[in-house]
Amino acid sequence: MSLVIPEKFQHILRVLNTNIDGRRKIAFAITAIKGVGRRYAHVVLRKADIDLNKRAGELTEDEVERVVTIMQNPRQYKIPDWFLNRQKDIKDGKYSQVLANGLDNKLREDLERLKKIRAHRGLRHFWGLRVRGQHTKTTGRRGRTVGVSKKK
């Protein structure tokens, strides 16, 4: 970034209901969106033909629109299925990249489905216990500590 700020520089961009810092490089700035990691950001920017060294605030409206459309429709732009974060969806069997608020909704739906079918993982979530097989005898205790009274 040059020392002189361009005329059309935006310090904060609003993309997919997320505030993006315009001073950061675009590849790292769009990782602020839920469901977009560094690898996915790089692939999207390559498909959109945007310089990776550009700052997010230097993007034109057209470039921002291109990035958003590629992020929302990755399969149309030949991003492989194994790269996406929602593979073989339980309802429709489709592959997709879930972003921002949609990611929260999908996660909540998945947990509700697990609880409804009384799966072990769903029950552990319901009880507020560890889900992934960790030991819980000594760690992960909550609530007040109970002291030991000394015998006289």
From Swiss-Prot:
Reported consequences of knocking out the gene: Embryos have a reduced forebrain, kinked tail and inflated hindbrain ventricle.
Protein origin, superkingdom: Eukaryota
Gene Ontology cellular component annotations, sorted alphabetically: cytosol; small ribosomal subunit
Alphabetized GO MF terms: rRNA binding; structural constituent of ribosome
Keywords annotated in UniProt: Cytoplasm, Developmental protein, Ribonucleoprotein, Ribosomal protein, RNA-binding, rRNA-binding
A Pfam family reported for this protein in Swiss-Prot or TrEMBL: Ribosomal_S13
Gene Ontology terms describing biological process: regulation of cell cycle; translation
InterPro entries reported for this sequence: Rbsml_uS13_C, Ribosomal_uS13, Ribosomal_uS13-like_H2TH, Ribosomal_uS13_CS
Gene3D superfamilies from the UniProt entry: 1.10.8.50, 30s ribosomal protein s13, domain 2
Subcellular location per the Swiss-Prot or TrEMBL entry: Cytoplasm
Family: Belongs to the universal ribosomal protein uS13 family.
HAMAP family reported in the protein's UniProt record: Ribosomal_uS13
Function: Component of the small ribosomal subunit. The ribosome is a large ribonucleoprotein complex responsible for the synthesis of proteins in the cell. Plays an essential role in early embryonic development.
Assembly and interaction partners: Component of the small ribosomal subunit.
Protein name as catalogued: Small ribosomal subunit protein uS13
Organism: Danio rerio (Zebrafish)
The encoding gene: rps18
